[in-house]
Amino acid sequence: MKIETIAVHGGYTPDPTTKAVAVPIYQTVAYAFDNTQHGADLFDLKVAGNIYSRIMNPTNGVLEARVAAMEGGVGGLAV
């Protein structure tokens, strides 16, 4: 894939229901946990997931994956 294509589409798979190709903006600051153990596992980094929007959120996750793909890396970190 060309870098221009990766810059626009990398790190995101279109929603299967809506077929939307634009990355959604999640207007939330907190995420629900399945139970207390799930919350503990998230904070201990035992499982991947969203905890709090300043730490990780789906929109930043796409940015990190997209930049990593453009640079040939395995991961990224948006600060």
Model feature map: region roles:
Residues M1-V47:
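N-terminal glycine-rich, Lys/His-bearing helix-loop that initiates the first secondary-structure elements
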Residues N35-V79:
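Conserved N-terminal alpha-helix of the aminotransferase class I/II PLP-enzyme fold
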